[in-house]
Protein backbone atom coordinates (compact mmCIF):
# COMPACT_ATOMS: atom_id res chain seq x y z
CA UNK A 1 0.00 0.00 0.00
CA UNK A 2 1.36 3.40 -0.98
CA UNK A 3 -0.12 6.69 0.15
CA UNK A 4 0.87 10.31 0.01
CA UNK A 5 -0.26 13.67 1.29
CA UNK A 6 0.50 17.05 -0.22
CA UNK A 7 -0.67 20.28 1.37
CA UNK A 8 0.58 23.86 1.57
CA UNK A 9 2.88 23.01 4.48
CA UNK A 10 3.45 19.27 4.25
CA UNK A 11 4.54 16.56 1.86
CA UNK A 12 4.58 12.97 3.10
CA UNK A 13 4.47 9.43 1.79
CA UNK A 14 3.65 6.13 3.44
CA UNK A 15 4.34 2.60 2.36
CA UNK A 16 3.14 -0.65 3.92
CA UNK A 17 3.29 -4.35 3.11
CA UNK A 18 1.52 -6.98 5.23
CA UNK A 19 4.63 -9.18 5.31
CA UNK A 20 6.97 -6.38 6.44
CA UNK A 21 8.81 -7.04 9.70
CA UNK A 22 7.41 -3.85 11.29
CA UNK A 23 3.86 -5.26 11.09
CA UNK A 24 4.56 -8.47 12.96
CA UNK A 25 2.27 -11.29 11.88
CA UNK A 26 -0.83 -9.18 11.15
CA UNK A 27 -2.51 -11.78 8.96
CA UNK A 28 -1.69 -14.71 11.27
CA UNK A 29 0.04 -16.72 8.56
CA UNK A 30 3.56 -16.65 10.01
CA UNK A 31 5.08 -15.30 6.80
CA UNK A 32 6.75 -12.13 8.03
CA UNK A 33 9.97 -11.33 6.15
CA UNK A 34 12.75 -10.33 8.59
CA UNK A 35 14.57 -7.03 8.05
CA UNK A 36 16.98 -7.12 5.09
CA UNK A 37 16.13 -10.80 4.40
CA UNK A 38 13.79 -10.55 1.41
CA UNK A 39 16.42 -11.24 -1.28
CA UNK A 40 15.29 -14.24 -3.35
CA UNK A 41 12.86 -15.52 -0.70
CA UNK A 42 10.59 -18.32 -1.88
CA UNK A 43 6.85 -18.79 -1.40
CA UNK A 44 5.05 -18.36 0.95
CA UNK A 45 7.30 -15.40 1.85
CA UNK A 46 7.29 -14.25 -1.78
CA UNK A 47 3.70 -13.01 -1.77
CA UNK A 48 4.13 -11.13 -5.06
CA UNK A 49 5.25 -14.10 -7.18
CA UNK A 50 2.02 -14.51 -9.17
CA UNK A 51 1.68 -10.78 -9.77
CA UNK A 52 5.34 -10.44 -10.80
CA UNK A 53 5.12 -13.50 -13.06
CA UNK A 54 2.10 -12.04 -14.83
CA UNK A 55 3.98 -8.76 -15.29
CA UNK A 56 6.85 -10.65 -16.92
CA UNK A 57 4.51 -12.68 -19.12
CA UNK A 58 2.86 -9.47 -20.36
CA UNK A 59 6.26 -7.90 -21.01
CA UNK A 60 7.31 -10.95 -23.03
CA UNK A 61 4.06 -10.76 -25.01
CA UNK A 62 4.89 -7.11 -25.77
CA UNK A 63 8.28 -8.14 -27.18
CA UNK A 64 10.34 -7.33 -24.07
CA UNK A 65 12.42 -10.42 -23.19
CA UNK A 66 12.95 -10.86 -19.45
CA UNK A 67 16.21 -12.20 -17.99
CA UNK A 68 14.82 -12.89 -14.51
CA UNK A 69 12.67 -11.59 -11.66
CA UNK A 70 12.97 -12.02 -7.91
CA UNK A 71 12.26 -10.40 -4.52
CA UNK A 72 14.84 -7.72 -3.73
CA UNK A 73 17.07 -7.33 -0.66
CA UNK A 74 15.08 -4.53 1.01
CA UNK A 75 11.74 -4.66 2.73
CA UNK A 76 9.05 -7.18 1.81
CA UNK A 77 7.29 -6.17 -1.38
CA UNK A 78 10.39 -4.87 -3.16
CA UNK A 79 11.38 -6.82 -6.23
CA UNK A 80 13.48 -6.67 -9.37
CA UNK A 81 12.51 -7.50 -12.93
CA UNK A 82 15.47 -7.44 -15.29
CA UNK A 83 14.84 -7.32 -19.03
CA UNK A 84 17.45 -8.68 -21.42
CA UNK A 85 19.96 -6.13 -22.65
CA UNK A 86 18.94 -4.57 -25.94
CA UNK A 87 19.49 -1.64 -28.26
CA UNK A 88 19.26 1.56 -26.20
CA UNK A 89 16.52 3.37 -28.09
CA UNK A 90 14.38 0.21 -28.11
CA UNK A 91 14.97 -0.32 -24.39
CA UNK A 92 14.13 3.33 -23.63
CA UNK A 93 10.73 2.75 -25.22
CA UNK A 94 10.46 -0.62 -23.46
CA UNK A 95 11.13 1.02 -20.07
CA UNK A 96 7.96 3.08 -20.42
CA UNK A 97 5.96 -0.03 -21.37
CA UNK A 98 7.49 -1.91 -18.42
CA UNK A 99 6.35 0.78 -15.97
CA UNK A 100 2.87 0.80 -17.56
CA UNK A 101 2.59 -2.98 -17.22
CA UNK A 102 3.87 -2.95 -13.63
CA UNK A 103 1.45 -0.22 -12.50
CA UNK A 104 -1.58 -1.81 -14.14
CA UNK A 105 -0.83 -5.41 -13.14
CA UNK A 106 -0.17 -4.34 -9.55
CA UNK A 107 -3.54 -2.59 -9.52
CA UNK A 108 -5.21 -5.76 -10.83
CA UNK A 109 -3.77 -7.63 -7.82
CA UNK A 110 -4.90 -4.94 -5.37
CA UNK A 111 -1.37 -3.62 -4.94
CA UNK A 112 0.29 -0.29 -5.68
CA UNK A 113 3.58 -0.06 -7.56
CA UNK A 114 5.96 2.77 -6.83
CA UNK A 115 9.35 3.66 -8.22
CA UNK A 116 10.26 5.89 -5.27
CA UNK A 117 14.06 5.64 -4.92
CA UNK A 118 14.20 5.36 -1.12
CA UNK A 119 10.72 4.70 0.28
CA UNK A 120 11.67 3.21 3.66
CA UNK A 121 14.28 4.73 5.99
CA UNK A 122 17.01 2.27 6.86
CA UNK A 123 16.08 -0.16 4.08
CA UNK A 124 17.70 -0.83 0.73
CA UNK A 125 16.73 1.59 -2.00
CA UNK A 126 13.99 0.94 -4.45
CA UNK A 127 13.08 2.60 -7.70
CA UNK A 128 14.08 1.90 -11.22
CA UNK A 129 17.67 1.50 -12.25
CA UNK A 130 19.12 0.56 -15.60
CA UNK A 131 22.01 -1.62 -16.73
CA UNK A 132 23.93 -0.20 -19.68
CA UNK A 133 26.37 -1.91 -22.01
CA UNK A 134 28.00 0.05 -24.81
CA UNK A 135 29.68 -2.02 -27.53
CA UNK A 136 32.03 -1.08 -30.38
CA UNK A 137 32.73 -3.81 -32.92
CA UNK A 138 31.14 -6.27 -30.49
CA UNK A 139 33.46 -5.37 -27.60
CA UNK A 140 32.51 -3.54 -24.38
CA UNK A 141 33.54 0.12 -24.46
CA UNK A 142 33.23 0.96 -20.74
CA UNK A 143 35.91 -1.39 -19.42
CA UNK A 144 39.64 -0.60 -19.21
CA UNK A 145 41.84 -2.58 -16.81
CA UNK A 146 44.30 0.34 -16.68
CA UNK A 147 41.70 3.09 -16.33
CA UNK A 148 40.58 4.81 -13.16
CA UNK A 149 38.22 2.36 -11.39
CA UNK A 150 38.82 0.02 -14.36
CA UNK A 151 36.69 2.29 -16.54
CA UNK A 152 37.61 3.65 -19.96
CA UNK A 153 37.72 7.33 -20.89
CA UNK A 154 34.54 6.72 -22.88
CA UNK A 155 32.82 5.41 -19.75
CA UNK A 156 33.81 8.54 -17.83
CA UNK A 157 32.59 10.79 -20.66
CA UNK A 158 29.35 8.80 -20.84
CA UNK A 159 28.72 9.22 -17.10
CA UNK A 160 29.71 12.89 -17.32
CA UNK A 161 27.17 13.40 -20.09
CA UNK A 162 24.46 11.77 -17.99
CA UNK A 163 25.33 13.96 -15.00
CA UNK A 164 25.45 17.12 -17.12
CA UNK A 165 22.04 16.47 -18.64
CA UNK A 166 20.34 14.71 -15.71
CA UNK A 167 17.84 17.51 -15.04
CA UNK A 168 16.59 17.40 -18.63
CA UNK A 169 16.62 13.60 -18.65
CA UNK A 170 14.53 13.45 -15.46
CA UNK A 171 11.96 15.76 -17.02
CA UNK A 172 11.57 13.31 -19.90
CA UNK A 173 11.90 9.94 -18.19
CA UNK A 174 9.05 9.98 -15.66
Model feature map: region roles:
Residues 1-174:
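Glycine-rich, acidic/polar active-site loops that bind/position phosphate-bearing ligands
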Amino acid sequence: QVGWRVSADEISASLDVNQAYWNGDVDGKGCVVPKQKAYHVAKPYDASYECRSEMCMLMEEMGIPIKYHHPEVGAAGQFEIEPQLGQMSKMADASMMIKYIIHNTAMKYGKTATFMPKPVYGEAGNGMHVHMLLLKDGEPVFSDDNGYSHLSKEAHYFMGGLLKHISSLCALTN
